[in-house]
């Protein structure tokens, strides 16, 4: 039997003091899904301001919903959106399924939308945290959502974006603070120097990842040193994709600064962990390697998903 999916749509125009943002929303009947298209300019992609997200709603809604915004990794290999051609990764697909079961609205953000980005284009990735903040500020005005219970999570590249919330540069761009964040398998080789913030955090790492543990161990200690409440959990015997069949392969990865990570400071300067000043160009040269991870059987991915949702449940109050 052929399935017919019906869409309804409407437009919003949001004005600020010197600009406007056209927001288009499409509702997918019978799927408890909405899609939103909005603008988040990135200087790396002039004229390609559109970003989209797919919002998954619980079947039964009682009161205002807590919201998880999910940022995909470099490979959007898990789920194609119902409209507009957006995609997310496999962990995002499972987070959406588990999250709505637990009563969350789960927002799958596609920050690569129509930008022609391939997983190997590490130097061209957008500053996706900006899109997440724009989206949060939009959704915070929607009366269906509890603007005091917004959570941010991501995998790999997305996990690195989530950790940027500990930078004072990005933390100050939302009217109400994020409740908590989860960074699943971030690289931690190039990070923001953190400030002390109220956001609760969890870093999940595979012990056999090609994004080797020492980098995230160092950054976790730094986050705690400045006063943040952040946990680090490792899953034994699994690689970057939470698989048990992991090996080291060939492909671009930001893992060349494992033992001396690069930090960006609030004033825009860069230093390595040992205090040596550096530049963006040197960081790119030293930190990007051709040593990637292989193996996507994902036997332990559901464990990482459960860790994520359980952590948010703990702080969902």
Regions found by a protein language model. Give the residues of each.
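C-terminal catalytic histidine-bearing segment of alpha/beta-hydrolase fold enzymes
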Residues: 229-317
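A conserved short beta-strand
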Residues: 172-187
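N-terminal cap/lid segment of alpha/beta-hydrolase-fold proteins
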Residues: 23-63
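Short beta-strand/loop motif that positions the catalytic acidic residue
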Residues: 197, 203-205
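Alpha/beta-hydrolase active-site loop
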Residues: 91, 95, 121-143, 164
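Short substrate-entry loop that stabilizes the transition state in hydrolases
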Residues: 61-65, 70-117, 209-213
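Short glycine-enriched nucleophile-adjacent loop
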Residues: 159-172
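Alpha/beta-hydrolase fold nucleophile elbow
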Residues: 144-156
